[in-house]
Amino acid sequence: MTTADRDDRELLDAHVSGDPEAFGELFARHRDRLWAVALRTMGNREDAADALQDALISAFRRAGSFRGDSQVTTWLHRIVVNACLDRLRALKVRQADALPDDLEEHVGRGSTHTISTVEQPDAAALATERRERVLAALATLPADQRAALVLVDMEGYPVADVAVMLDCAVGTVKSRCARGRRRLAALLTEYGVTQVTTEDGNRPPPAAVPPSDAPRGPPS
């Protein structure tokens, strides 16, 4: 059996047993999603790359402590999110610090929902603009709310799995999502974007928080 033929748990066990290729294969399988979580949680590529590196070092060293009471992917995401939150706390990042320097180009000055009647953007341009505004607003949320929304709304994980990743109760995840969505909705109204919310704390329709078009994977 080759390294590529093994499932995640077998790769992790092989890594613990000394297989030099196993962890690299495991990371390669989940690289894009782990990077997406880090990028959306941190708000910029440089900090996301640092947080992901912290997480991978931690996972590499702590693989022997994996108890098997969750999926390996859940365990990896939990380590990545914790690394992001630790770095945010260490850097004392304020809510607005993760906003891009060119935010005004994304959301404009004052009211932003007016579209020129002379030159109407095509659907792709409108979708890109909307996505940028959502991600900019997301970056202003408190770290715990941001992490919950990234995992539930953008990555599509069930609330129960996110509770494991964040090491908190299911009700806490739902509460963080609900508070985050309310704050996000208020910001998006200012930005001229309609935000869909749900009452039960579970994932809203995909259009509510669109995926990022940022390059996949951490910078090489």
Q: Positions of the model-derived regions?
A:
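C-terminal edge and immediately downstream basic/flexible tail or linker adjoining helix-turn-helix-like DNA-binding
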Residues: T2-A4, A14, D102, R109, ...
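Charged, low-cysteine interdomain linkers and short loop/connector segments
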Residues: R94-P121
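Short, charged helix-capping/linker segments at alpha-helix termini
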Residues: T2-T3, V16-E25, W35-D54
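Arg/Lys-rich amphipathic alpha helix in sigma70-family domain 2
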Residues: R61-G68, R78-L99, G108, A127, ...
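Residue-level preference for hydrophobic side chains embedded in well-ordered alpha helices
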Residues: L26, H30, L34, A55, ...
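Short helix-capping/turn signature of helix-turn-helix
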Residues: R29-D32, R40-G43, V150-P158
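Sigma70-family region 2
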Residues: V16-S17, R40-N44, D54-Q71, A90-K92
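Helix-turn-helix DNA-binding module
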Residues: L135-A147, L151, E155-T172
